[in-house]
């Protein structure tokens, strides 16, 4: 079950908010392969990881450490060719029915058709905050960096250091925000052909299996939590304890322009614009969705 830190521990963590610890090491040291038997592999001296999916099973891994606020970077190269029906998920999550979660999900497609990048935020077990995007490149040709920046003020989703989505803390409007539960990093490759591609109309072509996604370049500048206490490396204090100034650096004028560019040309779904879904009015956090 996901732990909710007591008030004393939480206040201690917030005092050192974002005095981060950077981990840019071996997948062997930082992650456990959790399911899929031989379908998950760590190789190249711990610098590379792959997940595979076949008709029998997918595969997945999770971090050994738990994090509470920080920036998580991972380079991925997604399943090439006909990836319809497959989902590559990369996300932060706590455990239990009132869990918090911050999601990247890459929904596969038929050969020559674009992946859909699905994002979502869960707080206290409630999600339904989806935004979806096409990418401005082919994510199967090369590695690209997908980042989650998690702060008490907001969550930023980034692709190759370009912000694509900002989820602001709207607790003053009664909207829960992920800030109390430490989360681990998870990733999995699995079959979801009942919904992933065109709402389930396109099924997985098992003649193309195994499907494989590749990972490298993991980095975490974050606070880790263990047994109710936190560890943050002081050498990152200057970049993570500056509060609003650091937030401004992440979303400076150029970053805001890039965010608007992505949302204008590549966003294909936004729950904050779905009148059919919310005929009585949009969720309250949608009022704070613009940057």
Swiss-Prot record:
SUPFAM superfamilies: Concanavalin A-like lectins/glucanases. The record marks 103 as: Important for catalytic activity. Residues 1-24 form the signal peptide. It comes from the Eukaryota. Its EC number is 2.4.1.207. Residues 25-215 form the GH16 domain. Xyloglucan binds at residues 105, 118-120, 128-130, 194-195, 199, 277. It catalyses: breaks a beta-(1->4) bond in the backbone of a xyloglucan and transfers the xyloglucanyl segment on to O-4 of the non-reducing terminal glucose residue of an acceptor, which can be a xyloglucan or an oligosaccharide of xyloglucan. This is Probable xyloglucan endotransglucosylase/hydrolase protein 16. The gene is XTH16.
